[in-house]
Amino acid sequence: MRLSRYFLPTLKENPAEAQIASHRLMLRAGMVRQTAAGIYAWLPLGLAVLRKIEGIVRDEQKRAGAIELLMPTLQSADLWRQSGRYDAYGPEMLRIVDRHERDMLYGPTNEEMITDIFRGAVRSYRDLPRNLFHIQWKFRDEIRPRFGVMRGREFLMKDGYSFDLDVEGARRAYRKMFVSYLRSFARMGLKAIPMAADTGPIGGDMSHEFIILAETGESAVFCHRDLVDMAVPGDDIDYETDLNPVIAARTDLYAATDEKHDAAKFDAEVPKDKQLSARGIEVGHIFFFGTKYSQSMGALVTGPDGKEVPVQMGSYGIGVSRLVGAIIEASHDDAGIVWPDAVAPFTVGLINLKSGDAETDAACESIYEKLTAQGIDVLYDDTDERAGAKFSNMDLIGLPWQLVIGPRGLKSGTVELKRRATGEKEELSPEAALAKIAG
C-alpha cells in the first residue's frame, strides 16, 4: 500500500481526552476516531489490526474443535424473559421497541440466543458434544465509558459456548478452551496469565480470567513469577489427549487479582524472590455455568437411558477490540506503538528518503514489488514529507520493520533496516534486507 493513496489521518499532538497510552496512541496513529461517547469508527490501520487479531482467535478456536456461526446483534426480549434476565440486567442493556411494538435489545451477551438456537436443533446425546462460537459486535451502555476501546460501549467479542451431556464432558470442553486461549494470546505476542475467577452460585473451579501485565491495568494482580514466561503448547498440540498437565502447571501456582487475593496464602505459597505484584488487563474469561440457561429455557437432550436432561454449558469470551488497546498498553515506548509481528497492520514500513529522485524511486519501487510478491504487507511512504517526519510517523504506527532507502546508501549499494522493537539498525544490501524481513 502506498501511503500517498492510503487513509492515515495521524495527529501530531496528544489528544486532551486520552488518559492512557493505548487511547492516546490509537488516536494519534489514525487507527480510530470517536463518533459518540464510548463508540469508535475503526479506520483502515486500526481495522487491519482488528482483522489480524480476529484471524488468530478464529484459527485457534477451530483448531480446538469449535465451530463458527454468526448471531445477530439485535435480540428478542422474549428470550431474555425466559431466562429471567430481562428485568434483572439493568441500564447497561440498550432496549429497543420496533414498529410493531415488540420489545427488542442490542445484545450485551449471547447466552439466551445460543441456547435458543441449540434447543431448536439438538435433542439427543448422540449430537453432543458441541462447541459453537461467533465474533460479533456488542453494546453495553456503560455509565462512564473511558480509556478508548478498553472500556467502550460498543465492542467486538468472541463468544463461545460448549454443550455437553454431563459435567465431565463440560470439563473436557473447558480444558480445550483453556489451552486454546493460552495459544491465542501467545500468538499475539502476549504473556497471558490465567487467574481463578469468581464462580458465583455454581461454585467449583471452572472459572478463569486471562490477564496480561500492563502498568495501566484496571486490576492489581499477584502471582508466581514463573507464570509470566511459562512455555505455551506448540502447533503439535493434540486436543484429544489429556490436557490436565498443561493446565495444572499453571493452576498449581498462585495467581489472583485483587478481588480474589489472599495475602497470607500468597506469602505461604510463593517464595519472596518469586512474588510478582503488578497491574493487569483482562483479555479473556472462561467459565462453566452448568444448567443455568438450559434448565430455564428448556434446552434438553435425551440421554442414553432415554430420560431428558438439561445440557451442561460453558461460556468462553475474548475481547477482540479490547485486545487492540491491551496489546498497545503492553507494547509501546515514548515514540509510539511497537506491534508484535503477528498483529501488525503491515510488516514493513518502506521509507523513500528522496521522493522524486529517479534512482531512489526506482530502487523503492523494485523492493516494494519484491516484498509484495512474497506476500509481505508493506506500507510504502512515497510522500514528499521531510525525512524526520517520515521517521516519526513510522515509529508512531509501530510496524515491525522500517526499510529506509536514500541516495547516499544507494551509492554504496546499501539500504538501512531498522527493527522497531529493539531500535537496532543495519546497513545491508537490498537482497540481504529482503531476506531478513522474509525470515
UniProtKB/Swiss-Prot annotation:
It is an enzyme of class 6 (ligase). SUPFAM superfamilies: Class II aaRS ABD-related, Class II aaRS and biotin synthetases. It catalyses: tRNA(Pro) + L-proline + ATP = L-prolyl-tRNA(Pro) + AMP + diphosphate. The keyword Ligase applies. It is found in: Cytoplasm. GO terms for biological process: prolyl-tRNA aminoacylation. Its EC number is 6.1.1.15. GO terms for cellular component: cytosol. Keywords: Aminoacyl-tRNA synthetase, ATP-binding, Cytoplasm, Ligase, Nucleotide-binding, Protein biosynthesis. Transmembrane segments: none annotated. GO terms for molecular function: ATP binding; proline-tRNA ligase activity. Homodimer. Catalyzes the attachment of proline to tRNA(Pro) in a two-step reaction: proline is first activated by ATP to form Pro-AMP and then transferred to the acceptor end of tRNA(Pro). PANTHER family: MITOCHONDRIAL RIBOSOME PROTEIN L39/PROLYL-TRNA LIGASE FAMILY MEMBER, PROLINE--TRNA LIGASE. Belongs to the class-II aminoacyl-tRNA synthetase family. ProS type 2 subfamily. This is Proline--tRNA ligase. It comes from Parvibaculum lavamentivorans (strain DS-1 / DSM 13023 / NCIMB 13966). The lineage of its organism: Bacteria, Pseudomonadati, Pseudomonadota, Alphaproteobacteria, Hyphomicrobiales.
